């Protein structure tokens, strides 16, 4: 099999990278009706598998779970989760032949084995669904021509998909139809019904492509979403301890600082996050972020280049074939870092303290979000897609660190995201060490004193923050989500 993206000519590559259309609410007037009365079989009962299935069942669809014989015989976690929630469970051979839609929600590295097993069992004219297009785009999986291939990709962890649905809302979602597999022209109808069944249509749906979803998703998770948070955590902790800060306090400031800072990001973008600072601190955070962008731009560009070319995927798949040797080594090394093993701080840190003493962390967030967004857009990815894969998902990942530090983040994210995270963070930490050595008092761990500021400089910095393209598209998309939630609640 060959990387699908690399089989396309340049015009086709650019067309698929740039496919992104915000869909209107009226396009989902039929809800999930296209799939009602049809059999939907989900393969895999992890976080996405279980929670999407619960939402789809509550939306009136016929949902069952196909598991491997040994998972059923040994009553593994997937079997327990499905049966405890009242779902029908069976083997591939029992359920797949009757399925109208088979949804593959297993981890990326299992996709090829799963598809090779289920494809011969699928009836003529059935549909195959994914929530991430890696298997189609990067592995280059060939699917029978009578099978329709679609994607519904919620831009949140599975638990959030369920919780937002229960609130009467949903999470922003990308949908796509694989252009090589839409024999009956029904792919978009299937994808729309599936997205509606998960509640995604109530938060906003982007019509995208498998290519755009994969390339932007990989870039976001490797850089700002996971790699930058990991590198930033390790660098900031070590710097604080070197300066004499109590390791327990330093650990808490960082562990919960990311979540507190990015909560402002979620509500009002980079503008609101920066507005939480005093004027002198805002000017300093802006200056630090500009320095960071200059230093890190080549690293972000290298990751994007390796994602576009397929270099990243081929390297990771080689590690799959080598029993995840690199991944497991990096995971073990991360677990032994000083940040991960630091004692817990029992005292309280007030919300504003995280901002006042985390100026560098805010600068890292701003620089990372803007760089990821800019690099994706420069590579042909549309701004809305780049926003969802950078700023939008960052608070969700920061929340995992608040739960159990980097360990929890790396457990929750996919192995694909974890592998990319380590690639980035292992390069970023040494890259930023000279920068860290030049920090000034007040950049981290101590508040910057109030003082006079130059009005013209403050005016220009505020304008630069607010006029960045990610702030413009973010304001539009956040406004749309707020309006949609208001409509959903009123309904």
UniProtKB/Swiss-Prot annotation:
**Binding positions (substrate):** 414
Organism domain of life: Bacteria
Give the catalysed reaction(s), semicolon-separated: (2R)-2,3-dihydroxy-3-methylbutanoate + NADP(+) = (2S)-2-acetolactate + NADPH + H(+); (2R,3R)-2,3-dihydroxy-3-methylpentanoate + NADP(+) = (S)-2-ethyl-2-hydroxy-3-oxobutanoate + NADPH + H(+)
A GO cellular component term found in this entry reads:
cytosol
Q: Which cofactors go with this protein?
A: Mg(2+)
Q: Where does NADP(+) bind?
A: 45-48, 68, 76, 78, 108-110, 158
Q: Where is the active site?
A: 132
Alphabetical UniProt keywords: Amino-acid biosynthesis, Branched-chain amino acid biosynthesis, Magnesium, Metal-binding, NADP, Oxidoreductase, Repeat
List the transmembrane segments.
Answer: none
Gene3D superfamilies xrefs: N-(1-d-carboxylethyl)-l-norvaline Dehydrogenase, domain 2, NAD(P)-binding Rossmann-like Domain
An example molecular function term from Gene Ontology annotations? ketol-acid reductoisomerase activity
Any Pfam family:
KARI_C
Name the positions where Mg(2+) 2 binds: 217, 389, 393
Per the entry, what this protein does is: Involved in the biosynthesis of branched-chain amino acids (BCAA). Catalyzes an alkyl-migration followed by a ketol-acid reduction of (S)-2-acetolactate (S2AL) to yield (R)-2,3-dihydroxy-isovalerate. In the isomerase reaction, S2AL is rearranged via a Mg-dependent methyl migration to produce 3-hydroxy-3-methyl-2-ketobutyrate (HMKB). In the reductase reaction, this 2-ketoacid undergoes a metal-dependent reduction by NADPH to yield (R)-2,3-dihydroxy-isovalerate.
- Family statement drawn from the similarity comment of this UniProt entry: Belongs to the ketol-acid reductoisomerase family.
Record's protein name: Ketol-acid reductoisomerase (NADP(+))
The organism named in the record is: Escherichia coli O7:K1 (strain IAI39 / ExPEC)
């Amino acid at each position: 099999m060959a990387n699908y993206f690399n089989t396309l000519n340049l015009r086709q590559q650019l067309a698929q990278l740039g496919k992104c259309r915000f869909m209107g609410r009226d396009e989902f007037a039929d809800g999930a009706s296209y799939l009602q009365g049809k059999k939907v079989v989900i393969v895999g009962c992890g976080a996405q598998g279980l929670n999407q299935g619960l939402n789809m069942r509550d939306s009136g669809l016929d949902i069952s779970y196909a598991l491997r014989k040994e998972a059923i015989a040994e009553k593994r976690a997937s079997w327990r989760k499905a049966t405890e929630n009242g779902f029908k469970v069976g083997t591939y051979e029992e359920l797949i032949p009757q399925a109208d839609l088979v949804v593959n929600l297993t981890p990326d590295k299992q996709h090829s084995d799963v598809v090779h097993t289920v494809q011969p069992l699928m009836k003529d004219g059935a549909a195959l669904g994914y929530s991430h297009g890696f298997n189609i785009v990067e592995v280059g999986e060939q699917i029978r021509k009578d099978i329709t291939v679609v994607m519904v990709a919620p831009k949140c962890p599975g638990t959030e998909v369920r919780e937002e649905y229960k609130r009467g809302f949903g999470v922003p979602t990308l949908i796509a139809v694989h252009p090589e597999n839409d024999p009956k022209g029904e792919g978009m109808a299937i994808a729309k019904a599936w997205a509606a069944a998960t509640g995604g249509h109530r938060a906003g749906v982007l019509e995208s492509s498998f290519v755009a979803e994969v390339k932007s998703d990989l870039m976001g998770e490797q850089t700002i979403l996971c790699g930058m948070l990991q590198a930033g955590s390790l660098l900031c902790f070590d710097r604080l301890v070197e300066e004499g800060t109590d390791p327990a306090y330093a650990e808490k400031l960082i562990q919960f600082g990311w979540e507190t800072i990015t909560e402002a990001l979620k509500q009002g973008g980079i503008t609101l996050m920066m507005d939480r600072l005093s004027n002198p601190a805002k000017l300093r955070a802006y200056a630090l972020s500009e320095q960071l962008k200059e230093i890190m731009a080549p690293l972000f560009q290298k990751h994007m280049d390796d994602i576009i070319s397929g270099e990243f995927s081929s390297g990771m798949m080689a590690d799959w074939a080598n029993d995840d040797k690199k991944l497991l080594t990096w995971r073990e090394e991360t677990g032994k870092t000083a940040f991960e093993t630091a004692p817990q701080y029992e005292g309280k840190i007030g919300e504003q303290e995280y901002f006042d003493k985390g100026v560098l962390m805010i600068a890292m967030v701003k620089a990372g979000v803007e760089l990821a967004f800019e690099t994706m857009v420069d590579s042909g990815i549309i701004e809305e897609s780049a926003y969802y894969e950078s700023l939008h998902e960052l608070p969700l990942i920061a929340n995992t660190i608040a739960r159990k530090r980097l360990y929890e983040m790396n457990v929750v994210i996919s192995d694909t995201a974890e592998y990319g995270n380590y690639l980035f963070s292992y390069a970023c930490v040494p890259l930023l060490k000279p920068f860290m050595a030049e920090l000034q008092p007040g950049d981290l761990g101590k508040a910057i004193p109030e003082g006079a500021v130059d009005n013209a400089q403050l005016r220009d910095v505020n304008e630069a923050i607010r006029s960045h393209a990610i702030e413009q598209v973010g304001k539009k998309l956040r406004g749309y989500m707020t309006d949609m939630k208001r409509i959903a609640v009123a309904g």
